[in-house]
Amino acid sequence: MHEMKYREGLTPYKRAKYARQEAALLRRDQESQIPIRYRILESGLPPAAQARALKKYQTLAVLEDPTQFCKLRTWLEGVLRIPFGKHHAAPCKSHRSKIKRLCDTKAAMDRWIYGHAEAKESIVHMVSQTLANPHGTPQSIGIIGPMGNGKTTLVRQGIARALQRPFMQISLGGMSDVTLLKGHAYTYENSSWGRMVDVLMEARCMNPVVYFDELDKVSQSDKGDEIISALIHMTDTSQNTDFRDHFFEDISIDLSRVVFIFSFNNEKAISPVLLDRLYLIRTQALQPADKCVIASSYLLPTVARNIGFAPDQLRLAPAAARFLLSQIPSEKGVRQLKRALEHIVLRLNTMKLLNEACRKRTKKADIGQILGTIQCPAAAKLTHVLHFPLTLTPDLLRQLVHPKPSPSYEFMYT
């Protein structure tokens, strides 16, 4: 009775959401109860892969060695997790729906990231092409720009959101072995499949947006060359319908519908062969005026929300943003600026909790003990006089952090 009454009070959106979740959980439970033989027969595996999996299953039935049995079982379970034939579709049939998708894409990028007008325009063009020909072969993309200037956000909130596909990230920084990407051969002990197959399993579709971060940081060695060769193969439209993971060497995996995106800072460090395959989107270094806007309108609201402040409880005055920039090393992005804001807001959060404790007459000894952990004496004295909502000014920031001893933001962490 209570359940029916609760359901009647739900919005249509929530009812549909709960129905989808329940159906997915029941379907997963049913799949786990279906014998492997029938899961192979009912799977979307290509005929050749299906035949190979059935042969493996027949071998499994007569294996006596428990180690080999477990390994072959893992192989079969892994193959059945690859989402063969499943694609995320975002149909926009009418002209109006396509225009709305483009407008939503631009609005989402503007909401999440400031500036980068040329890069945003390039992304809108790319999305337009996909809307015009949704079954076409997607272009591989290279997004260039300095560290911390918003490349990942552009891809996640721009391209992946516009295409309505899962966003999967693979970090290439320092990667020195192609087996991390393509797996180990089945014959090796404790071998498994590689990260590329992993992201397909996690995305549960064969056309996710796969974002390779720090392409220019791949190891400069023979092993690094093997990684680049694998990436060239994966982005080659004449070959990527037949990708082979080392663990599933007999199974052909079609990567032709995957949207591959690579980010890098140094264009000269990229293999010319791979670079030639990429549609390049360039992002620029952020200017001080841009950083001030980003700090007050983008970074502070995000940091404050993550730490637990209400949206209107903290505001950064323009002069305070300029002061903060003067206290950190010159950078082309905003990573250090974000770290500085995080430290300040964390300190403010502790002071806010102590302020509330004072009003509730918490033991002075307890409050004093926590105040002793705040290493900035001026900040500790502010605890009793801060009131929220609060506007951060240069004078307040000077009291919240230690005086600048050197051209480094590290003073904020002492």
PLM segments and residue spans:
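C-terminal engagement/docking regions of AAA+ P-loop ATPases
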Residues: 335, 340-414
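Conserved catalytic/switch belt of AAA+ P-loop NTPases
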Residues: 212-253, 276
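AAA+/SF3 P-loop NTPase mechanochemical coupling elements
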Residues: 203-208, 243-263, 315-316
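The Walker A (P-loop) glycine that initiates the GxxxxGKT/S ATP-binding motif of P-loop NTPases
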Residues: 145-146, 183, 214
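Walker A/P-loop
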Residues: 132, 136-172, 201-202, 232, ...
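AAA+/P-loop NTPase substrate/partner-engagement loops
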Residues: 161-191, 199, 219, 290
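Conserved C-terminal "switch" segment of AAA+ ATPases
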Residues: 42-49, 204, 266-276, 280-342, ...
